[in-house]
Amino acid sequence: MKLSDFDYHLPKELIAKYPAQPRDSCRLMVLNRKDKTIEHRIFRDVIDYLKPGDTLVLNNTKVIPARLIGKKEKTNANIEVFLLRPIEDNIWETLIKNVRRLKKNQKIIISDDFYVEFLSKDDEKAIVKIHSKDIKSDLEKYGHVPLPPYIEREDEEKDKDYYQTVFADKEGSVASPTAGLHFTKELLEKIKEKGVNIAYITLHVGLGTFKPVKTEDITKHKMHEEYFTIPKETLEMIKKTKENKKSLVAVGTTVVRALETYGKFGKTEGFTDIFIYPPYEFKIVDKLITNFHLPKSTLLMLVSAFADRDFILRAYNGAVKEKYRFFSYGDAMLIV
């Protein structure tokens, strides 16, 4: 398939800059794969599509305040360090603009006793050492929420809450698993009361999630890697759900990537670079809750594999017409 097969026109004003409040009051477009019908609901109505014995799988990763803004030692020039992932104690893989201008061991001062030391350049990434008495507390204090570039505004204090799911638990993401943002604690409680199982996986979302596809032949695209783990109790719940012929409902493309890596390769922990595009035979996932994705993105390819490309593009064009809100802070879609 070609990259141009996954394009659609999106007016810029439909890109959400802030999320709906309360979280579960955003719009929900429901796509039925069997009869190709589309319904327009509110997110909290998602409970109507879940049955006792079904299993809802959520990604409990937690977004770290990954953007650090500091000053170069000696020159005092402003510079941004974007943390990607820890390699070992205090050594991080990062993105730094104009990294070529940095000298080995040059310091980037964030505060009096919190600074970043540039070690080396690896591909487009910069390897740094973080000097801090308490990294976690310094990141909370000085780090900025890593909002996606298309939101086109500076992060605000309230984004620390908005851009984190209510069940975030395991630190490590530099982008939010956004389908999970729509759930409130109350809605999850009601879902449990209905007899639906709730299970968790962890997949740390990397910046690669925003990486554009540059090859017209999509099969030539090199997919980014992300670290994931599926706990034993979740595996047992998946098995039980399948045995009872109930539905496995994935909340977000990150959950799909983790579960399908397990379904296809039997892997329950480690890095996954699974690239799902049509035609793909899903092994685990029966229903999918997701947001509206960027044109020509790997995430749009994944949902097109799940539902059918023509149906998805018809739904997206309908969403534009109905003025749905798009991307990370936007509205949601349920595919049954």
UniProtKB/Swiss-Prot annotation:
Catalytic activity annotation: 7-aminomethyl-7-carbaguanosine(34) in tRNA + S-adenosyl-L-methionine = epoxyqueuosine(34) in tRNA + adenine + L-methionine + 2 H(+)
Pathway info: tRNA modification; tRNA-queuosine biosynthesis
Principal subcellular localization: cytoplasm
Cellular-component GO terms for this entry: cytoplasm
Function: Transfers and isomerizes the ribose moiety from AdoMet to the 7-aminomethyl group of 7-deazaguanine (preQ1-tRNA) to give epoxyqueuosine (oQ-tRNA).
Family: Belongs to the QueA family.
Protein name from the UniProt record: S-adenosylmethionine:tRNA ribosyltransferase-isomerase
